[in-house]
Amino acid sequence: MICNTHRFNLGFLLLRGRRRRVSTTKRTAMLVLLVVLLATSSVTVSAAAPDPVLEWIGVMNTAVLAGGSSPLVSTRVVALVSASVFDAVNGIDPRFRPLHVRPDAPHHASQRAAAIQAAYAILVDVYPAQSASLTTQRNASLAALALTEEANSIAAGVAWGQTVADAIWAWRLTDGNAPAPAPFLGVQSIVGLPGAVGFWRPTPLANGGPGASGAGPQYASMTPWVLTRPSLFRLPPPLALNSPEYATDLNELRVMGIFSGSGRTQDQSDLALFWAGNTPLYWNRIAAQLSTARGLTLTENAHLFALLNVSMADAAIACWDGKYRYVFWRPITAIRAGLTPADADPAWVPWLDFFPGGTPAHPEYPSGHSTVSGSAAFILAAAFGENTAFSVTSEVHSGTRSFASFSDATAEIADARVFGGIHFRTSCLRANALGRAVADYVSRHAMRAHGDNRDHEQDDE
């Protein structure tokens, strides 16, 4: 049934709680009943449905922020959502090799409905406290879709989207993301190294309180999405503490990263704050902006965001492999302790430490922001061209920043971490290269178009 305006009761579709307790057959029957029941209504629709991939990328961003997920945890969440949406959409009209779920959907199933349900199902699993608002959004999305698609097609798409989300969720349940059983305290956790120079330890808070234990040590050994192992592109060790390059990095931080009396301009202080938010979400906003401008199709969007977010997830795993391999100290520790007593500056405070987040609670090398951003920039440059202009907003600082290329953006992100006083420049530059290497690998090994037979065996070892 297709008409201009529908008022629905979408109650049957509210498979609240743990949806996996409802059998597939019973669930599908309920969905079919629902979509054809166009009577009493709690949802009003008067406009055509938007692209559900872009719509639910926006819903995902909102849910991640509301859920308070860290940038590290967010890389896994956005990959779960985008992988599910991609395999759901591609499974109905297979144009690419699947990431995980073999295409097995009814040919009449709605790709749009499948995308909506796949994204919804993952988000409710990750953020059960948001199930009511997510369900309301899902119902509105399906109601808008019924303006242009038949009820049986929508029902089949919803059932397929749920099937794919269940499969992706089950696949990644055993990826090693469970929190570590014991806190990681850096040199205090490494036998024979307590107090050793150059090694990370919990960094003091701006208010003088003790710092938190290392965040996400389990990510260092998490099963990657596409990489064969977390260490596939492991970086060389950090700069030697007695090297001139390290001295250059350290001196730059002393002047440019300090809270007060720095050599920063106002714009440099602002950009450090601007980029202090949830990095994966910045790149999803950028991708959505460019997709809209270029008019990408549903399938193209599903593929783009899956490549983007799976690449960022594997980049984060590769980054954490390096962090917990080398356990390198943060600038605040390096500058306060010094290599010698004469070199120490115990009163030094980084610019970002008086703002939410401050110095991140994990080892310094390599930079997480720069690794993830290098990965994202590689994927988006491949899709839209390196010298593509775009702008981006921040959830933690007002204003909009604009760029003429993706390299310009990643260079500014490196500046932001240095000017914030939380990363050495070399760490950011090497991290950017790491992220690009990961994204290149992912794009050549996963979700390739049928007929794309690029040789990729040489870098599997």
Predicted regions and their residues:
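N-terminal secretory signal peptides that target proteins for export/translocation
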Residues: M1-T25
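Alpha-helical and His/Cys-centered functional microenvironments
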Residues: L10, V35, S373, D460
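Short, flexible coil/linker elements and helix-boundary hinge sites characteristic
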Residues: L15-R16, S41-S42, A146
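Structural motif marking the loop-to-transmembrane transition
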Residues: T25-K26, Q111
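Bacterial N-terminal signal peptides
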Residues: A29-S41
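Acidic/polar surface patches and capping/hinge elements
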Residues: A48-N453
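Glycine- and aromatic-enriched low-complexity segments, predominantly in secreted/extracellular proteins
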Residues: D452-E461
